[in-house]
C-alpha cells in the first residue's frame, strides 16, 4: 500500500491561485451588474386597532413621466379611480401610457390595521429609479395616500444602490380627492360606495374628517374608531433588493467553474501517476 503525506505540489498551488483569480474575474461582471434587481415591496398598515384600512396599493418604478395629481388642483380621472373605490384601473392605464418602460404592480388586498402584504417586481434601476404609489383609505368617500410629486421618491441612486429603504405615511398626509361629497351612507367600507355624488372640489390634505365615521360598523365587522392625530404613522412601504445576475455572466461563471474543475482533475490524475511510477 502506498500512502503519502506530502504537501501539495507547486503546480497544484499555482492551480489553486489561478482558480481563485478566475473565479474573481468571472464573478466581477455579476457583482458589477447593479442595474437590474428584484425589489420586494412590503406594505404595512400602522393604524390603531379598529382604525382605517387601505385598498390594494398601486405602485410603479419609473423615470418621472407620470404625475397622477397635484395639491390644489381638480383630481384627474386616474387618481379618482384610486380614491373612489380603490380599483385604480385608470391610474394603471395612464401610468402605462405616460411611461411605457415603467414597472408597475398592485400590492396586497384590503389591508386592515396591523396587516401587511408584499410584491416582488423586477426593476431596471437605471431606467426606473423613481417610485410612485396610490391607494384608497377606507372608510371614506374619496380619501387616498400617494405622492403628488413624481420625483419625490428616488429610491435608487446613480449606481443602482437602494437610497430609500422605506417610506412612512402619516395621518396628516392623507389626501381628499375632492371628487365626491362626504356621505357615510355612500362611503366605502361602511356604506354603499356606488351611491356617489360628485363634489367638484380640489385635492387637499384631510384626515380629520375620518372621525365622522366613528361608531359605524365596517365591512370587516369591527366598530370604527379613527384615533388619529396628524403625526400618527398610518402606513409604511419598505423595499428589499436582490441583485439579478446577467445571463451571460452566469454562463461565463458556470463554464469557468467547469473548466477549472476539469483542469484540477487532470492535474491530480497526472500527479497520482507520477507518484505511482516513482514508487
Segments from the language model and where they lie:
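Structured domain cores in non-transmembrane regions
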Residues: 36-38, 46-162
Amino acid at each position: 500500500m502506498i500512502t503519502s503525506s506530502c504537501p501539495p505540489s507547486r503546480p497544484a498551488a499555482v492551480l489553486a491561485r489561478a482558480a481563485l483569480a478566475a473565479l474573481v474575474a468571472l464573478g466581477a461582471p455579476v457583482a458589477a451588474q447593479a442595474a437590474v434587481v428584484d425589489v420586494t415591496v412590503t406594505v404595512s398598515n400602522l393604524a390603531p386597532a379598529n382604525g382605517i384600512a387601505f385598498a390594494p396599493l398601486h405602485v410603479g418604478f419609473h423615470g418621472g413621466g407620470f404625475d397622477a395629481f397635484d395639491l390644489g388642483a381638480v383630481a384627474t380621472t386616474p387618481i379618482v379611480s384610486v380614491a373612489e373605490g380603490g380599483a385604480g384601473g385608470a391610474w394603471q392605464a395612464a401610468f402605462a401610457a405616460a411611461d411605457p418602460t415603467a414597472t408597475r404592480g398592485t400590492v396586497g388586498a384590503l389591508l386592515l390595521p396591523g396587516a401587511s402584504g408584499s410584491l416582488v417586481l423586477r426593476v431596471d434601476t437605471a431606467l426606473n429609479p423613481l417610485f410612485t404609489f396610490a391607494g384608497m383609505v377606507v372608510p371614506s368617500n374619496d380619501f387616498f395616500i400617494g405622492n403628488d410629486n413624481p420625483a419625490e421618491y428616488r429610491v435608487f441612486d446613480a449606481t443602482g444602490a437602494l437610497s430609500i429603504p422605506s417610506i412612512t405615511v402619516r395621518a396628516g398626509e392623507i389626501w381628499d380627492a375632492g371628487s365626491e361629497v362626504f356621505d357615510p351612507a355612500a362611503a366605502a367600507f361602511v356604506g354603499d360606495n356606488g351611491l356617489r355624488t360628485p363634489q367638484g372640489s380640489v385635492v387637499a390634505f384631510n384626515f380629520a374628517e375620518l372621525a365622522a365615521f366613528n361608531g359605524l360598523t365596517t365591512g370587516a365587522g369591527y366598530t370604527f374608531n379613527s384615533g388619529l392625530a396628524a403625526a400618527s404613522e398610518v402606513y409604511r412601504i419598505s423595499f428589499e433588493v436582490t441583485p439579478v445576475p446577467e445571463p451571460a455572466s452566469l454562463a461565463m461563471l458556470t463554464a469557468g467553474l467547469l473548466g477549472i474543475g476539469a483542469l484540477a482533475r487532470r492535474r491530480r490524475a497526472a500527479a497520482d501517476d507520477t507518484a505511482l511510477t516513482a514508487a
